[in-house]
């Protein structure tokens, strides 16, 4: 239940008094000329919005984590006192008209597991908008993520056309694992700003997203075991790979990352000189139009580091390698039939 409604005459007044408001309050920011009004249910943007792009679209749940409280409302959240209702696996929300909206918020009180997680179901055509952290702690959007918080959350939602935002810079193990796998209507991916990764954080995240044409930037320079494992596997419409700036690799970091990306023609530049176990294992497997690779590795002795990594690429192409590297030819080395160009590696003295 709400305890109070706080009225502020300006956004600056709201910000000055924000920390002193009672919890579970509604705040209305009112400009003097009433041209602007904003309502905040305890925290600004403490919800995500699903908008029907097709009449009769539905949203439900296939699974609900035992740690997950999930609430929804079809009321206008930009007016005081929207009524929030509890969401469970027996609830199906029908958006009768194109443009109808439903708002979700939640709290995840414990770490999920690979058998205890929340998964949405959808029909029709639906766009998501807003900070996905609002599903895990709508009262504190910058709260640390829980393990497996987004595990399979929208997997198989072929009706999802736009993903919610994922602004977290501190991740948790498996946090976005298979989160959007088989979302075949997604064409773009949300930004992923984290620069330090944790194990399996992006594993299979967009696996099977066959309409995805644009990958997010991947600024991370500190990798983790299986962090990008099969991240874009089967993304057959992906035409440009993101840059991979990390220079130190870890086990299975890029394993299967672009497996089956048949529209890729150019691999991301691979600057690390020392490979790690399974780091490029099946990385570019089945990329049938791929015809350009620049890989500057000089130590390729790690276990299965390049096993089948270029199996099924274009029969002709260009491979740029370090001048002092020793590669074999074939599906686990330099593709047969490709032109090889050697390049000096610049040594930076500290």
Segment roles from a protein language model:
Residues 1-350:
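Solvent-exposed loop and capping/linker segments of extracellular ligand-binding repeat ectodomains
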């Amino acid at each position: 239940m709400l305890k109070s409604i706080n009225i502020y005459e300006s956004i600056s007044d709201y910000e000055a008094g924000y920390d002193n408001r009672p919890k579970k309050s509604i705040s209305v920011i009112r400009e003097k000329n009433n041209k602007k009004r904003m309502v905040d249910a305890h925290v600004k943007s403490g919800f995500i919005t699903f908008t029907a792009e097709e009449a009769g679209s539905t949203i439900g749940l296939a699974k609900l984590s035992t740690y997950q409280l999930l609430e929804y409302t079809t009321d206008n959240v930009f007016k005081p006192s929207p009524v929030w209702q509890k969401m469970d696996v027996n609830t199906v929300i029908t958006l009768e008209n194109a443009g109808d909206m439903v708002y979700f918020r939640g709290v995840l009180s414990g770490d999920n597991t690979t058998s205890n997680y929340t998964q949405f179901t959808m029909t029709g055509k639906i766009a998501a908008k807003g900070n996905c952290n609002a599903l895990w702690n709508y009262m504190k959007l910058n709260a640390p993520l829980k393990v497996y918080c987004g595990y399979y959350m929208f997997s198989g939602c072929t009706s999802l056309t736009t993903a919610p935002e994922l602004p977290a810079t501190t991740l948790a193990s498996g946090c976005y694992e298979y989160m959007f796998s088989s979302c075949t209507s997604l064409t773009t991916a949300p930004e992923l700003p984290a620069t330090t990764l944790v194990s399996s954080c992006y594993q299979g995240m967009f696996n099977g997203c066959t309409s995805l044409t644009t990958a997010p930037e991947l600024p991370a320079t500190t990798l983790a075991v299986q962090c990008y494992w099969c991240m874009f596997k089967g993304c057959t419409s992906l035409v440009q790979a993101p840059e991979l700036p990390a220079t130190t690799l870890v086990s299975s970091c890029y394993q299967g990352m672009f497996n089956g990306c048949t529209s890729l023609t150019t691999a991301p530049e691979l600057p690390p000189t020392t490979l790690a176990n399974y780091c490029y294992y099946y990385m570019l497997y089945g990329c049938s139009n791929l015809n350009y690779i620049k890989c500057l590795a000089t130590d390729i002795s790690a276990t299965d580091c390049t096993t089948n990594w270029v199996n099924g690429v274009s029969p002709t192409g260009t491979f740029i390698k370090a001048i002092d590297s020793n590669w074999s030819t074939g599906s686990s080395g330099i593709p047969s039939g490709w032109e090889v160009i050697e390049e000096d590696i610049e040594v930076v003295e500290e």
